[in-house]
Amino acid sequence: MTAYWLAQGVGVIAFLIGITTFFNRDERRFKKQLSVYSAVIGVHFFLLGTYPAGASAILNAIRTLITLRTRSLWVMAIFIVLTGGIGLAKFHHPVELLPVIGTIVSTWALFCCKGLTMRCVMWFSTCCWVIHNFWAGSIGGTMIEGSFLLMNGLNIIRFWRMQKRGIDPFKVEKTPSAVDERG
């Protein structure tokens, strides 16, 4: 097996991990699954030799986990500076800056936005990644980000319609425990 096909295999694994990410209405589960996906796709990009994308994806994974604990603007600024610095230091072609831009805007969204607004900004970020992945020849990366674009776009429309009907799509229903079901 060549390094190229190993990289593509890791990309397909990332595809399988990430395919259901945007169906999560629970933001904690959404962020955890997004973090795992980001780490695996980061390995994929390093194996392909697209280092700005690999570094951006690994920073995405770490950043997404950290947003579960804090929404500090200082922490956000650190991730934005790291992403921009690493991306600018390693890029060789202008298209390699798209994942850096996508990571910066999604960092802002994860720290400063919630619900539908966060998902809309994430959709824009996904557009940046789709263009990059196609350019880089990433089969799994293009498949997953293209799927993210479609699924997140459809879910944005679905959640927006729910809000128009007065339903909070991000309110997670709690199942009653066995103790509560006596009766």
Curated annotation (Swiss-Prot):
It is a multi-pass membrane protein. It comes from the Bacteria. Residues 24-38, 155-183 are cytoplasmic. Keywords: Cell inner membrane, Cell membrane, Membrane, Transmembrane, Transmembrane helix. Its main location: membrane. The chain crosses the membrane at residues 3-23, 39-59, 72-92, 93-113, 134-154. This is Inner membrane protein YgjV. It comes from Escherichia coli (strain K12). The lineage of its organism: Bacteria, Pseudomonadati, Pseudomonadota, Gammaproteobacteria, Enterobacterales. The gene is ygjV.
